[in-house]
């Protein structure tokens, strides 16, 4: 999967300004009609206006959800794609119909009334199926998502340079040592030039998680393992204890507003930089803050620059504040929405949700991983527990 998107979120609906103008005009007319109406006519008009507005909001949400479903099922066979699309459209249709039937009288012996029990059972079975399937995803081995990234003026000696991106490992109460061993083994099997960990590596106190973290010592790559903090590292005790532990026990290079140059045998170099998570700006922890300018100091403007930033919103903030060269930002945090009932909130809250984006009017790209594991309940949508293998390619 290699998705290129412009400026993050753009659904078909928002690209068509005539729809916005038409709907605004309709809303204006309804408001004027309500203002001039009296008695029962006013009450009926108000009811119609309420239903129209709710259906409009649901249409916007449905459009976003359907476009996202189409993206998620692209890797599947055509027959499966059609099945998922049909199921999604039927679900959307019945969701809209259920709102209308709230205002339409149905006789006691109507088909819908007689099927009420069946519909309730079907809903419960569907919820159970989706939850069970989501749990199975988190118990299965992570998928390897291979992505080619074209970098402007990438030296030929670095063409084909590979990076394994791991995000949101969330070592904690439900992510045990065996799971980490599985992730490490699958990562090492890719024989990447570099391993990048973009935040949320741990989700607990150091004293409780020493054993589950031990397999991290076996992570291997040609140029080493590089790591930048996420928000969850700041939720448990002293973050510096974790950072010292990673550095001394596992030989992981922690990039706290710093960078390293990785050079090929011909002398061509890539600058890999990382920043503290943007959450530090709210927490006001001494010596912890996001400082992209400092992180990029020492990165030549003539060499490719890769920046580890855990949260996509933090990446957006950096792009608005710096003019220094950044070719590729590696992020996570969103879990690609993780599960159906929270996907919309993740979509609306984050500037970039999942996949490879090219920033408009620049040479900067950002890849947002769906994460190796999960946050909270151990459920996730299909193929969203991922290890990403990024291959850099030369682009003139």
What feature does the model see in each segment?
Residues 1-140:
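Non-catalytic terminal accessory segments
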Residues 11-20, 24-40, 48, 93-99, ...:
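Binuclear metal-dependent phosphoesterase catalytic core
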Residues 76-82, 107-119, 144-154, 176-190:
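Alpha-helical membrane-embedding segments
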Residues 153-396:
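Soluble catalytic domains of enzymes that build or remodel membrane lipids, polysaccharides, and related
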């Amino acid at each position: 999967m290699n998705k290129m998107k412009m400026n993050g979120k753009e659904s078909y609906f928002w690209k068509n300004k005539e729809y916005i103008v038409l709907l605004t005009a309709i809303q204006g007319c309804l408001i004027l009609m309500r203002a001039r109406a009296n008695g029962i006519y006013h009450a009926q008009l108000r009811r119609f206006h309420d239903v129209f507005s709710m259906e409009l909001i649901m249409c916007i949400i449905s459009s976003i959800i359907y476009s996202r479903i189409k993206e998620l099922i692209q890797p599947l066979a055509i027959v499966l794609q059609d099945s998922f699309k049909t199921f999604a459209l039927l679900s959307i249709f019945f969701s809209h119909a259920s709102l209308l039937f709230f205002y339409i009288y149905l006789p006691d012996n109507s088909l819908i009334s007689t099927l009420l029990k069946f519909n309730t059972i079907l809903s419960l079975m569907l919820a159970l199926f989706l939850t069970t399937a989501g749990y199975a995803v988190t118990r299965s081995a992570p998928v390897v998502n291979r992505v080619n990234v074209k970098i402007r003026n990438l030296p030929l000696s670095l063409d084909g340079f590979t990076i394994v991106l791991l995000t949101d490992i969330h070592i904690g109460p439900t992510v045990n040592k065996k799971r980490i061993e599985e992730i490490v083994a699958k990562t090492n099997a890719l024989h990447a030039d570099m391993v990048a960990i973009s935040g949320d590596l741990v989700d607990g106190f150091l004293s409780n998680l020493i054993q589950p973290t031990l397999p991290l010592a076996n992570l291997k790559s040609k140029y080493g393992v590089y790591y930048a903090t996420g928000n969850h590292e700041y939720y448990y005790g002293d973050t510096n204890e974790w950072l010292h532990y990673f550095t001394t026990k596992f030989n992981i290079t922690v990039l706290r507003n710093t960078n390293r140059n990785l050079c090929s045998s011909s002398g061509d170099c890539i600058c890999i930089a990382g920043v503290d998570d943007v959450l530090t700006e709210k927490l006001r922890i001494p010596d912890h803050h996001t400082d992209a300018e400092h992180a990029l100091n020492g990165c030549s403007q003539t060499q490719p620059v890769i920046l580890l930033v855990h949260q996509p919103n933090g990446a957006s903030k950096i792009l608005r504040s710096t003019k220094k060269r950044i070719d590729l930002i590696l992020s996570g945090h969103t879990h690609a929405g993780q599960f159906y009932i929270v996907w919309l909130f993740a979509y609306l809250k984050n500037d970039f949700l999942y996949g490879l984006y090219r920033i408009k009017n620049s040479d900067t790209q950002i890849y947002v991983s769906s994460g190796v594991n999960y946050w909270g309940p151990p459920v996730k949508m299909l193929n969203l527990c991922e290890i990403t293998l990024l291959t850099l390619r030369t682009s003139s």
